[in-house]
């Protein structure tokens, strides 16, 4: 089956979505119950379910995140095939300073799941780009704004700030009065990146 809409240049040949209802956030009890089902499907001992959230939410060990992402995507029952977002939250007083948060969506089941990975300031987290290609620029943004390194990322470099920018602007200890304007000297130091993929 091929579908071409006025919004797409390339025909879509995949299966039609099985659930065409709009996403409606569920109650806490339903989210917790669904989280129990997902946790049983995954069976990772280092995964902790966070209850009382607006969607099924889990804290995952950084060493298991790639396996959890793969299982959520490849499971025929769960089918979390779309990464909606990846972002970080900075807790400077905590030993594991950053929460790196993944939000995934299942077109098949019309539901969302949230995964949190806690990492320290000098720790790296494995990249998820081998599972979801769409995580590429999300990971670059988290690296640029917070300094979280994604091991194995195919092109981990700044995406929102220039190469001469020092620091990471969304960290809570970043001085907002500090400005890193791009000067002619900085421009001379920057190596232009010509990426044939774009």
Regions found by a protein language model. Give the residues of each.
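Terminal low-complexity/charged segments
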Residues: 1-198
């Amino acid at each position: 089956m091929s579908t071409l809409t006025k919004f797409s240049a390339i025909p879509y040949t995949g299966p039609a979505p099985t659930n065409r209802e709009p996403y409606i956030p569920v109650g806490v009890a339903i989210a917790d119950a669904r989280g129990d089902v997902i946790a049983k499907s995954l069976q990772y001992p280092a995964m902790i379910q966070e209850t009382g959230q607006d969607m099924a939410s889990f804290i995952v060990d950084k060493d298991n995140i790639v396996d959890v992402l793969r299982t959520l995507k490849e499971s025929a029952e769960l089918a979390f095939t779309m990464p909606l977002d990846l972002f970080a939250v900075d807790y400077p007083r905590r030993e594991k300073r950053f929460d790196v948060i993944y939000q995934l969506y299942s077109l098949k089941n019309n539901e969302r799941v949230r995964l949190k990975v806690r990492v320290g300031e000098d720790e790296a987290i494995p990249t998820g780009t081998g599972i979801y290609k769409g995580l590429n620029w999300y990971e670059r943004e988290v690296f640029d704004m917070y300094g979280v390194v994604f091991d194995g990322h195919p092109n981990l470099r700044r995406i929102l700030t220039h190469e001469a920018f020092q620091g990471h602007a969304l960290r809570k200890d970043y001085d907002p009065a500090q400005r890193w304007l791009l000067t002619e000297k900085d421009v001379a130091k920057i190596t232009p990146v010509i990426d044939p993929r774009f």
